[in-house]
Curated annotation (Swiss-Prot):
It catalyses: RNA(n) + a ribonucleoside 5'-triphosphate = RNA(n+1) + diphosphate. GO terms for cellular component: chloroplast; DNA-directed RNA polymerase complex; mitochondrion. It holds the Pfam family RNA_pol_Rpb1_5. The gene is rpoC2. This is DNA-directed RNA polymerase subunit beta''. It is found in: Plastid, Chloroplast.
Length: 1446
């Protein structure tokens, strides 16, 4: 054994490890194993010579335990009191309890250890605990300290600890609580092994084809190892240097490139103080689907360079998966004890005064235990000046992020806590906890003095106790203040009142309150001279005829529950007039003044002034005449093709308002005439050959057009056909004259008595139509009918009473047009143009509650009516009162006759026990409530005790917490205090921050970047944009270019989004001008300035935005604020992928705020939610968090970020916006992520980096103000660099999980796997390549394709990097046999078959499945040779071809 220094010390577990490692690296594995054997025999030899015994007496419980428990209990009581006083929230109290217990249990453990160390170093328990063999400290702590806090089944902490230990014995509750953890350990072991096995399978599947195939890939990229970054020497040994290392002083060569790093070499670097060197890694290797020897480095099992043909992928998969199976066993041993690292505390050694150094910067912060502390923003120091002058001044160094519980110049006692470090690596879970009210009561929010400029405010609200009673609708109160109220007396009453007289009847009496109803029936009404008759065949589902004063109406009736009565179904329309006055023979076109309808549908116009209003004469002169005449001319042009002009809303709205908005308007009389042009239409579907007439023929009445179809009118036929099939035949009724010179008669109207061409007499109003055929000119004279439509009027006396009292229904005649004006009704049957209905409207009653039954009475020739009114109780009970204790009492008997407007009964809300009222308040908002403060809710206090407070002030009693509340009455000696309890909500959203500006945005032209004085540059380059225009001439060299859009940044609810802006449509601006008149304070909108830029695009998504700057300054706004509206249209069609709204700020920037859900003065019931609090829970750091976390990282899950409460109030933005120098001089550049890597969504980070690398940077040259903009990197470079960043992120995240579990895995294994996850890109624009958009290809592949394409001056493809999880990556394996044998077999195989893919059998799995020798290890030689043979044979073939040519 050469150069081994003899160690004459105690050798424990750690030294043993070092000894064996030394012998392994110095000699070899044989020697090391022999040494291990020898050590084993040595150990056994001495173990048999001296024994160790353990008895129950060795378990000594430290004497200080009781003191500590008492102190902890006292702290907890204190916390409860503070909480009741409203200084801390419920959640903070919980946190405080847990902290108190974990500190107590930790310090108890330290006591145990120090006790053993000083008094009993050979105690067998102590020896076992520190031997490093099996037992550990946490078990000793359970034996002789206290078991401490336990975790419940979901991994959260229970707030009651187990105070006993195993030496003292557990109580029954303790025992039950212990059961949770133990069970969890067993279950985990059973279930989690499967998980870890599956993880291994996926890892091996993704990396199975990675084999060492080359000696050197000649890469130029590498990792820079920096001495400032705390690197692990373990991870560096066995790597290979990329660049040579020189001595910084003498500039001599220390290590050449491609040297393997050994421990000696690293030590040499340390001596020479070489801080930076470059190493290779599997991530930097250039080979495709394999790795070269140099990049991989040592094979760790024999400390030599890895062999060619070694299957490193499978090694990597196994090395990562195997610890998973071990990790599952972790919880089993400790039995589910909750272990949280105790915080490192700074404890004052002496009494003295604290002073901070000048450079120490602090901010005020509220911790999750509700303490206000100072947090150091940079590292610095503080000094403690002791009381005694003889003692020395003590200086304490502070790190960054230390919490200080003291302020500067504060006096502090010995062993008080000065500060503590914030630990960052705890595993926590942020939750929201609803805070419920303990008692019913009234909410009172006192105003706190706060600084107004904070985004969040602290809220304090009191709940002052009392009883809340809800009232039914329309109720009245039933008592006065100072009353005593007996049990079961009522507070509210609602009267139930009927509308009509009649007989009463109560239905559903024994069911619950909501279903009960009271019915009042009256049979005294009738219709004279009328009867009802059943129609055998219902016409349009109307099944009865109502004969009334010799008029017939159609009516719908159904059978009612009694024999002779029929029940009406509808009241609107009640009956439809049955006459043929408006019935036409055939179809046609009808015209009427559309404004008649518009009385009813006026909401369909933008401003409901239409041309139905005339302008008064004097206003007419104001408008320039020509303007008005133009406008009338425009109207004249809008003449229907049949020669009628009808007032439609022809005018577009701008012209209208320009004329009409400025004038007083007069109503113009509208005539209800209707013009009818008949045109008979047959819809057919038949062959051309059956037709018996031709297009343009004139036929007589009753003429057969096609077999079995006979015309009803005479006229000209028009036939429309499609594909030799006749679709439609129309007959325009009228008389036809042959001749010439008919043009001037076209579209003219003639009236009876006029004569055309001296020989044609007109007998009825007609329209002339000129028909020009190839053969001849024809003049068609079409007669039209004019119908006059009666005005609607109210029928007064339709229903009469026996006593002739006033009727109970309002009856209206309603006329409805069944067709639109100008609409062609294509039919040959009879149609009704209008329908005349009678509508009934019951006076002063809810419509649905009245039911009408009819019955014929032939003796008296009248129709009897029976009117029933239903009073449903549920109409009087609002929805929120459905399940409260409402009662009701009836004052009427069944079948009693009552007059109208009688009180039938009451709905009441009862009181459960008798009270003496001190005070009451009632509210009449949307919910009616009464709040009673009775003696039970009050306490009386002597005035001296109440610190001389007067009425309406709040009292907090420090000693007796129950005596807290608001003073109601002060009578000089005693105070009556209404009990109350404060609740505290820190960091609530202040109302100011919810500005009403919902969506703000800023538009940016194409080339300007926007800069505010804040350090945010919003410059966002989106790579997924597709190019729009590709019309290029045949001889032009074509290059890919992208469409540029102006950018738009949108801010909504404090989040920023960016969107490449599509087409602008309109820019409205509504300018408010304030009137100078005093009497009208209203702002009138005076004018609309509307600029129109019409773009006719079909597929658009219109959007109206209110313009504003992104950041408004309330103080500086002196300019009048214009409400600019911008109408945007988003193109729907080609852009749904790329043009949209992208979020710029992720949710990391969101602050967590607590919410309060109630307003001042509200009454709430017991158990209602007052607000929500956010809080962090620590969860036990065992395997349950380990394996799933690793799986989540390797599967690259897109999880929503769950925010951790960082120490400061505002979340640190995880991507620091510009390069900024931190006050503790840590230099951070854009895009460096801060430690929170477990909360980062890797996909988003990928996007952010990629966009960053694609930014156009501007380079300025100052003399001529010459600016040049240049993109940072090209597409390949950007993707490559982005991938590198993400690879490191995932690597560090996975390693941190394994390290937290105490498992060490060599980085290179993880690197192999991660390399496989980050090779693919997604094509966004294909250019001239044969690829498709959204296709997934390898990065090196697309680079190769683009190289060739650019060499030919064609357009390259554009792409974005894609991160695949291990399952996805395994399915995207280039070999379809490997992918199909992994998962989703049929899908993978069908896809491969359709694409016609070829499997080159490169990996191990494919070859095993086919049955070949695997291409690694011994099979590697034959595998690499087969490629060489191929190449040789190819060249031979080429030679032969050349020979033939010669």
């Amino acid at each position: 054994m050469k150069d081994y220094i003899y160690q004459n010390t105690l050798i424990n577990k750690k030294q043993l490890k070092e000894l064996l490692a030394w012998s392994f690296s110095k000699y070899d594995s044989m020697q090391a194993s022999l040494l291990a054997d020898e050590l084993k025999y040595l150990g056994f030899k001495y173990a048999t010579q001296a024994g160790i015994s353990i008895s129950i007496e060795d378990l000594k419980v430290p004497a200080t335990k009781n003191e500590m428990l008492e102190k902890a209990n006292k702290d907890i009581l204190n916390a409860e009191k503070i909480c009741l006083k409203g200084k801390i929230t419920d959640v903070e109290r919980f946190q405080k309890i847990i902290d108190t217990w974990s500190i107590a249990s930790e310090s108890l453990k330290d006591n145990v250890v120090s006790y053993f160390k000083t008094y009993d170093p050979l105690n067998s328990v102590y020896i076992m605990a520190f031997s490093g063999a099996r037992g550990n400290l946490s078990q000793v702590r359970q034996l002789v300290g206290m078991r401490g806090l336990m975790a419940d089944p979901s991994g959260e902490i229970m707030r009651v600890p187990i105070k006993k230990n195993f030496r003292e014995g557990l109580t029954i509750t303790d025992y039950l609580m212990s059961g949770y953890g133990a069970r969890k350990g067993i279950v985990d072991t059973a279930l989690k092994t499967a998980n870890s096995g599956y993880l291994t399978r996926r890892l091996i599947d993704i990396a199975q084809d990675i084999v060492i195939r080359e000696k050197d890939c000649l890469t130029s990229s590498s990792f820079l190892i920096d001495s400032q970054t705390k690197f692990d020497t373990e991870q560096l040994i066995g790597r290979v240097l990329l660049k040579s290392v020189y001595d910084s002083k003498t500039e001599k060569l220390i290590a050449k490139a491609n040297t393997q790093l050994t421990l000696d070499l690293l030590n040499l670097f340390n001596q020479k103080q070489i801080s930076k060197f470059y190493i290779r890694s599997p991530l930097t290797c250039n080979l495709y689907h394999s790795i070269c020897q140099m990049c991989y480095g040592w094979d760790l099992s024999n400390q030599n360079l890895v062999d060619l043909g070694e299957a490193v992928g499978i090694l990597a998969g196994q090395s990562i998966g195997e610890p998973g199976t071990q990790l599952t066993m972790r919880t089993f041993h400790t039995g589910g004890i909750f272990t949280s690292e105790a915080r490192q505390q700074i404890i004052s050694p002496k009494n003295g005064i604290i002073k901070f150094s000048k450079i120490l910067k602090t901010i005020i912060l509220r911790t999750n235990r509700g303490e206000d502390v100072l947090l150091t923003k940079n590292s610095g120091s503080l000094i403690l000046i002791p009381e005694k002058h003889t003692d020395e001044i003590i200086q304490i160094e502070l790190l960054r992020n230390t919490m200080l519980f003291v302020k500067s110049n504060q006096y502090i006692k010995q062993s008080a806590i000065i500060g503590e470090l914030i630990s960052t690596d705890k595993q926590t879970l942020t939750e929201r906890k609803p805070i419920l009210s303990d008692t019913a009561g009234e909410i009172f929010i006192p105003r706190l003095k706060t600084r107004m400029n904070l985004i969040t405010q602290n809220r304090l609200l009191w709940i002052l106790s009392g009883q809340v009673y809800q009232a039914p609708s329309n109720s009245f109160l039933n008592f006065y203040t100072d009353h005593k109220i007996n049990k079961n007396s009522y507070i509210f009453r609602t009267k139930l009142i009927n509308q009509y007289s009649g007989y009463t009847k109560v239905l559903n009496q024994n069911k619950n309150l909501l279903e009960q109803k009271i019915q009042i029936t009256n049979e005294t009404y009738f219709l004279e001279n009328s009867y009802v008759q059943k129609i055998l065949k219902p016409i349009t589902n109307k099944n009865y005829l109502l004969n009334f004063n010799n008029l017939t109406y159609l009516i719908t009736l159904k059978d009612s529950n009694s024999k002779n009565w029929k029940r009406c179904k509808k009241y609107k329309p009640f009956a439809t007039s049955f006459n043929n006055n408006f019935k036409t023979l055939t179809g046609g076109i009808m015209y009427y003044d559309q404004r008649i309808k518009q009385k009813f549908d006026s909401f369909n116009t933008l401003i409901s002034y239409n041309i139905a209003y005339e302008i008064s004469k004097e206003d007419y002169d104001k408008v320039s005449k020509d303007h008005y005449e133009n406008y009338l001319k425009k109207l004249e042009n809008k003449i229907d093709k049949n020669g009628f002009i009808f007032y439609q809303n022809f005018l577009n709205y701008q012209e209208m308002e320009s004329i009409f908005l400025k004038f007083k308007l007069k109503k113009k009389i509208v005539h209800n005439s209707l013009i009818w042009l008949s045109e008979e239409t047959y819809k057919l579907n038949c062959d051309k050959n059956i037709l018996l007439v031709e297009n343009g023929n004139f036929i007589a009445k009753n003429f057969e057009i096609i077999p079995n179809i006979i015309s009803k009118t005479a006229g000209i036929i028009t036939v429309s056909q499609k594909n030799n099939m006749i679709e439609e035949i129309a007959i325009k009724a009228g008389f036809v004259y042959q001749g010439k010179q008919f043009e001037q008669l076209d579209k003219k109207v003639y009236y009876p008595g006029e004569i055309i061409f001296d020989n044609i007499k007109i007998t009825q109003p007609s329209l002339c139509e000129h028909i020009n055929n190839k053969s001849n000119n024809q003049l068609l004279i079409r007669p039209f009918a004019i119908y006059e439509i009666p005005k609607e009027k109210t029928v007064k006396s339709l229903f009469s009473d026996k006593n002739n009292s006033k009727s109970i229904f309002t009856i209206t005649n309603k006329i409805t047009y069944l067709y639109k004006t100008n609409q062609k009704i294509k039919t040959s049957n009879h149609i009704n143009l209008i329908s005349q209905n009678i509508n009934l409207k019951a006076k002063n009653s809810v419509q649905n509650n009245t039911i009408i039954d009819l019955s014929n009475s032939f003796k008296t020739k009248r129709l009897n009516l029976r009117i029933s009114e239903n009073l449903l109780l549920k109409h009087y009970i609002p929805a929120h009162l459905k399940y409260t204790n409402l009662q009701y009492c009836l004052l009427v008997e069944p079948t009693q006759f009552i007059d109208s407007y009688t009180t039938l009964g009451y709905l009441e809300s009862l009181i459960t026990n008798s009270l003496e009222i001190v005070k009451f308040k009632s509210k009449r908002a949307n919910k009616k409530q009464v709040f009673l403060i009775s003696n039970k809710d009050c306490i009386t206090v002597r005035k001296e005790q109440g610190k001389n407070k007067t009425a309406n002030e709040l009292i907090i009693d420090n000693i007796n917490v129950n005596q807290t509340g608001k003073v109601l009455i002060d009578n000089g000696q005693f105070l009556t205090v209404q009990k109350g309890r404060p609740y505290f909500f820190p960091n609530c959203k202040s109302d100011d921050s919810k500005e009403k500006l919902d969506l703000q945005y800023k538009l940016i032209g194409l080339n300007n970047t926007i800069s505010n004085n804040t350090n945010t540059f919003l410059n966002y380059y989106d790579v997924t944009k597709r190019s729009l225009v590709e019309r290029l001439g045949p001889n032009k060299k074509s290059y890919g270019f992208k469409v540029k859009f102006s950018k738009m940044f949108i801010k909504k609810n404090g989040k920023f989004y960016s969107s490449p802006i599509p087409l602008f449509l309109n820019n409205f601006s509504i300018i408010k001008e304030e009137q100078k008149r005093l009497n009208e304070g209203k702002n009138e909108i005076n004018n609309f300035i509307i600029k129109n830029t019409q773009l006719k695009i079909k597929q658009c998504l219109p959007l109206l935005l209110k313009s504003s700057e992104l950041v408004t300054n309330k103080i500086k706004r002196k300019t009048p604020f214009n409400n600019n509206l911008t109408g945007l249209k988003f193109l729907k069609y080609p852009f749904n992928k790329s043009i949209g709204i992208h979020s710029l700020t992720e949710d990391y920037f969101e602050q967590e705020v607590n919410n309060v859900y109630c307003k001042n003065g509200e009454f709430i019931e017991k158990g209602e939610v007052i607000g929500l609090l956010n809080f962090e829970k620590e969860i036990t750091g065992d395997i349950v968090q380990g394996l799933p976390r690793i799986e989540e990282l390797l599967e690259a899950r897109k999880k929503k970020p769950t925010n951790k409460h960082l120490a400061t109030n505002q979340k640190k933005s995880l991507l620091i916006q510009k390069t900024s120098i931190d006050s503790s001089f840590e230099f951070q550049k854009l895009g460096t992520t801060i430690k929170e890597n477990d909360k980062i969504n890797p996909h988003n980070l990928l996007k952010i980096y990629f966009n960053y690398y694609g930014i156009k940077k501007q380079f300025f040259s100052n003399k001529e103000m010459f600016a040049l903009s240049y993109r940072l990197t090209d597409n390949y470079e950007a993707s490559y660099r982005t991938f590198k960043k993400i690879q490191l992120l995932i690597l560090n995240a996975v390693q941190s999980v394994y390290e937290s579990q105490g498992v060490s895995i060599a980085n290179k294994h993880l690197e192999v796997i991660i390399k496989q996850m980050t090779t693919k890109v997604l094509i966004t624009h294909e250019g001239h390549t044969p690829l498709l958009p959204r296709e997934v290809v390898d990065l090196y592949h697309i680079q190769y394709i683009n190289k060739i394409i650019e060499a030919h001056n064609k357009r390259p493809a554009y792409y974005v990097p894609l991160l695949l999880g291990i399952t996805k990556a395994a399915l995207n394996n280039p070999s379809f046999i490997s992918a199909a044998s992994f998962q989703e077999t049929t899908r993978v195989l069908t896809k491969a078959a359709i694409e016609g893919r070829v499997d080159w059998l490169r990996g191990l799995k494919e070859n095993i499945i086919i049955g070949h020798l695997i291409p690694s290890g011994t099979g590697y030689q034959s595998y690499s040779n087969c490629f060489n043979q191929l190449a040789q044979s190819k060249t031979k073939i080429n030679l032969e071809k050349i020979k033939i040519k010669i």
